[in-house]
């Protein structure tokens, strides 16, 4: 039996982070967590990290697709926050971002990590951006790095 597993260390990885500007008071913490994880745990060099700002979470799939198509990156990390309000807008934005990023991940040759918070409240978002529920930006970064190494192992 063959078992393929991988580590998160990827010192030569080239990683793009697509991040939404909307709700940036939360997304800034996701970005800090992602960059810290890439550098400190993944040992990714600063010059191999590219950050691309987009207006909101709904625009993340298009940015991720464009980044993947350049063939400059080994992975794309999508970061954003969608907080439920009093209208159906949440479902459209959260669903569009989630489905769109899944589509890009399935049709590109590189990992696309999902670091988009979809929460019921601002408090839940803050908890998931670095307080008591960890930092989902850091988790997405580690997922991207592990998947880079998993795909390399599969192709070896």
From Swiss-Prot:
Belongs to the DMRL synthase family. Catalyzes the formation of 6,7-dimethyl-8-ribityllumazine by condensation of 5-amino-6-(D-ribitylamino)uracil with 3,4-dihydroxy-2-butanone 4-phosphate. This is the penultimate step in the biosynthesis of riboflavin. This is 6,7-dimethyl-8-ribityllumazine synthase. GO terms for biological process: riboflavin biosynthetic process. Its EC number is 2.5.1.78. The keyword Transferase applies. GO terms for cellular component: cytosol; riboflavin synthase complex. Forms an icosahedral capsid composed of 60 subunits, arranged as a dodecamer of pentamers. The lineage of its organism: Bacteria, Pseudomonadati, Pseudomonadota, Gammaproteobacteria, Enterobacterales. InterPro entries: LS (IPR034964), LS/RS (IPR002180), LS/RS_sf (IPR036467). (2S)-2-hydroxy-3-oxobutyl phosphate binds at residues 86-87, 128. It catalyses: (2S)-2-hydroxy-3-oxobutyl phosphate + 5-amino-6-(D-ribitylamino)uracil = 6,7-dimethyl-8-(1-D-ribityl)lumazine + phosphate + 2 H2O + H(+). Pathway: Cofactor biosynthesis; riboflavin biosynthesis; riboflavin from 2-hydroxy-3-oxobutyl phosphate and 5-amino-6-(D-ribitylamino)uracil: step 1/2.
């Amino acid at each position: 039996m063959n078992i393929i597993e991988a580590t998160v260390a990827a010192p030569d990885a080239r990683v793009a982070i697509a991040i939404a500007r909307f709700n940036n008071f939360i997304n800034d913490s996701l970005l800090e967590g992602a960059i810290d994880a890439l550098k400190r745990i993944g040992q990714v060099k600063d010059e191999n990290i590219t950050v691309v700002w987009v207006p909101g979470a709904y625009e993340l799939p298009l940015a991720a697709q464009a980044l993947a198509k350049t063939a400059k990156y080994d992975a794309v990390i999508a970061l954003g926050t969608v907080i439920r309000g009093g209208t159906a807008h949440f479902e459209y934005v959260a669903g569009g971002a989630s489905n769109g990023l899944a589509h890009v991940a399935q049709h590109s040759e590189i990992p696309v990590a999902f670091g988009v918070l979809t929460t019921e409240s601002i408090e839940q978002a803050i908890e998931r951006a670095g307080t008591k529920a960890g930092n989902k930006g850091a988790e997405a970064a580690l997922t991207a790095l592990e998947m880079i190494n998993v795909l390399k192992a599969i192709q070896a």
